[in-house]
Amino acid sequence: MSIRKQYDTDLESLKNSLTEMGRNSADAVENALEALCVADADAAAAIVKGDARINNMERDIEHRCMTLLLRQQPVAGDLRRISTAMKVVTDIERIGDHAADIAEIIPHLVTVRKEGDPAVSQAIVMGKKAHQMILDALDALTAENENAARRVIAADDEVDYDFNAIKHQLAQEIAEDPGKVDAALDLLMVIKYLERIGDHAVNVAEWVQFVRTGRYKDESMF
């Protein structure tokens, strides 16, 4: 195999690994939402345990990116793709971390909030929107689709709106019954992690724009 063919193969393998890692993180978020919905502490524990695999994938991808940069000294589009992989792998790993963070809270919520709790139900709706943002960001990354990336960025406004609405509702809960403060704070942390997940999806989308244009947040890079 020629050097160029091997290089192209390595780039494609890197792209596939990044996609696989992204799907694992997205699945972790989906599983966390399902565990939250049915108050399943055992499922939550499995999500926390599974985060180690996502962390290992991050380290592997970072190593492969550095190897390609040092051995091949890529330019133009290939350099942007590898640089983007090194950036988005961090966001994807953080998405997995936040899924595990949510899972760690679930056993506490089980004891203080009943199934069908309105605030929990609203948090799940918010979470589904954030989860869809992840899927759409990953699709945009795979296809290098700038228009799809823009739609992901625009979708974050709705997740932010939900976060603020639920936060206000939880504040009202505490005002009406200070004894509910622990239950409210636990759920506040859940929605904060979901809001951050949406932010990480936006970050991925912004790096898709960089791949296509060489500009990141309206600043020219290379």
Regions found by a protein language model. Give the residues of each.
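Cytosolic, long alpha-helical scaffolding segments
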Residues: M1-F222
